[in-house]
Regions:
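Outer-membrane beta-barrel translocator domains and adjoining extracellular loop/strand segments
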Residues: 114-122, 157-163, 213-221, 256-262, ...
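Outer-envelope beta-barrel architecture signal
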Residues: 97-104, 140-146, 198-202, 239-243, ...
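Transmembrane beta-barrel strands of outer-membrane/channel proteins
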Residues: 103-112, 146-152, 204-210, 245-251, ...
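Predominantly the C-terminal beta-signal and adjacent terminal strand-loop region
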Residues: 242-248, 256-278, 516-567
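Outer-membrane beta-barrel "beta-signal"
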Residues: 24-52, 60, 236-239, 554-567
Length: 567
């Protein structure tokens, strides 16, 4: 029965393509780690403090290939001894016959977050609930890995960015009326690796994430987000070394469909951020903001990425080099308002010192440019067409990141240290002849430990971070006669920069009870403290940053409950 269930997880995930876990309000994909509003690794989540020390994660982390883009890495290290340690009946069943080598888990969880330490678009009171399952199974000539999950989130008094993952795209749209927002995320993930000949494997991974994001108060909006990734791969291996190659194809898309249906007659405003919080402020259905453009439904934006990844391992050393080129646009049909492209290079290195100790190093370089189209509407014979007159580069951002991680894994005690440094340099040219440059740096350290006392696991985590940021402006043509740089959303800029690069510290505590034959229950509590602008309202203004109030000391509490089953 277990064999059938495990196969169902893996096959279902492959047939209905996943990406790892649901994206939270305060998480964004790695591409945009310094894009603007948030960082994916910015603040550790309270419900993550002990997950790295559980059986499934032990097995996953024991094979450095599992962190690569190559699905064939699933079979590169089949840790029979480790799986047998957690599940002795898996290798040889009660009847003495061989069984599939597999490990899986399923869990349901709920989290409540409260506090003013949050990004500009975050909620002071947020709850989320969801369920997920993951499985790895090895058979004689092939292996499968699968996962699926669902998460529902709801936050109060939310406004600012209208996108699901603020900062992922080089354009953002801000709205100014706080209200309740909900986000539902569905994820499916499947990977398979097959031995096709002596020393050769082929495989592939298919990821899918679908999101529905909505606000039910004017200015209300409904978003539909989609991420899909396909990564076929090949691997050659022998007893000494292994070499792999992966092709990567992915698509990300989102559509913001906004409307005002209230009867109060209030005039609602919006702001389109074209880079470094410079852009255009006006009534939300203004044609320059593009939320209500005739001939286009909503604000559609998408990106297609192509790339390759090369993997190599020798003995206990593993490395992966990845390159990704992305092309995207905002708009549709004749109305293409923005076009952007990017290059991303990343390097991962890992070394297993022995069965207990491992170390990982990663680095990323990301360069993205956005251009704004010059369009002209022409009506001839009652037919309106749009002419493309050219484009101007309005924004460029370059991100650099380095991360170092050390793990000690054992049956009695698990320890994880992480350190990271990230930097962004972005230049906006929204209104000629002015240019603005923003430079931001941030670094953080995290220590996480879990003690296993029989049927009880006690986890503790401490983290700290700091950074700096600076915005400068200059005029490339002082004789142009233009006096204004354009609309500047000063509160968005200051709030986001302080959240990303300000000093912060916090910690998590978790307690897990393990019941035989695999059932467990966990409670965790976390706190983060830092500086934030707690009492302010948005108003696009080109005012002086020095006139802003001093930021407040703010905290945020996380409480999480989880129940699950390891099998």
């Amino acid at each position: 029965m277990n064999k059938i269930f495990l196969a169902a997880i893996a096959i279902l995930s492959i047939a209905a393509p996943v990406s790892a876990v649901a994206q939270f309000y305060e998480n964004i994909p790695s591409q945009a780690q310094f894009a603007g509003s948030s960082l994916s690794s910015r603040v550790p989540s309270a419900d993550m403090s002990s997950s790295f020390a559980q059986p499934y994660d032990h097995i996953l982390r024991g094979n450095l290939w599992n962190e690569s883009m190559n699905a064939n890495g699933i079979r590169n290290v089949i840790d029979t001894a480790a799986i047998a340690l957690y599940k002795p009946l898996q290798v040889t069943g009660k009847d003495g016959k061989n069984k599939p080598l597999a490990i899986s888990y399923a869990q349901g969880y709920g989290t409540i977050e409260n506090g003013d330490y949050r990004p500009s678009w975050g909620s002071g009171s947020l709850w989320r609930a969801g369920a997920k399952a993951e499985s790895i199974m090895h058979l004689k000539s092939f292996s499968m890995k699968g996962a699926f999950g669902f998460e529902h989130q709801e936050g109060k008094d939310m406004c600012a960015s209208m996108f699901i993952n603020p900062g992922f795209y080089p354009i953002d749209i801000i709205e100014y009326t706080p209200g309740r927002k909900t986000l539902q995320t569905y994820t499916f993930d499947g990977a398979i690796a097959v031995d096709v000949a002596d020393n050769w494997r082929v495989g592939g991974e298919l990821d899918f994430r679908g999101s529905n994001y909505s606000k039910r108060k004017d200015l209300r909006h409904v978003n539909y987000g989609l991420h899909i990734l396909f990564a076929p791969s090949v691997q050659y291996y022998n007893d000494i070394w292994a070499l792999g190659l992966t092709y990567i194809l992915s698509k990300d898309s989102e559509n913001v469909d906004a409307e005002q249906i209230g009867t109060t007659g209030d005039v609602l405003y919006a702001f389109i951020d074209k880079g470094n919080a410079y852009g255009m402020f006006g009534i939300w259905d203004n044609s320059g903001i593009h939320l209500d453009e005739m001939g286009v439904k909503g604000f559609p934006i998408n990106q297609i990425s192509n790339g390759v990844a090369l993997q190599y391992s020798r003995g206990k050393l593993f490395g992966e080099l990845k390159w990704l080129y992305s092309n995207g646009q905002a708009g549709e049909k004749q109305f293409i308002w923005y076009k952007f492209h990017s290059n991303e290079f990343s390097l991962k290195l890992g070394y297993k010192i022995n069965d207990n100790h491992s170390i990982r190093l990663s680095g990323t370089y990301f360069d993205q440019t956005n251009r704004e189209s010059l369009l002209d509407k022409v009506t001839e014979g009652g037919v309106t067409t749009v002419r493309f007159l050219g484009s101007n580069q309005i924004y460029n951002r370059k991100n650099h990141s380095l991360a170092l991680q050390y793990n000690y894994d054992s049956r009695k005690f698990d320890l994880q240290f992480k350190g990271g440094w990230l930097a962004q340099r972005s230049v906006s040219n929204v209104k000629y002849p002015f240019s603005q440059k923003n430079e931001m740096k941030t670094w953080m350290a995290d220590a996480n430990a879990v003690w296993h006392f029989g049927l009880v696991d006690l986890g503790a985590e401490l983290f700290w971070g700091n950074g700096s940021y600076e915005l400068s402006s200059w005029d490339v043509d002082q004789e142009s006669g233009v006096q204004s740089e354009g609309d500047f959303e000063i509160m968005k800029y200051c709030s986001d920069m302080l959240y990303n690069a300000g000093s912060r510290a916090g910690g998590n505590l978790s307690l897990r009870f393990n019941f035989k034959p695999g059932l467990w229950f966990e409670i965790s509590e976390g706190l983060v403290s830092g500086k934030a602008y707690c009492n302010w309202t948005y108003s696009a203004d080109s005012g002086n940053q020095a006139l802003l109030p001093e930021p407040d000391n703010a905290q945020r509490w996380h409480t999480s409950l989880k129940i699950g089953y390891n099998f």
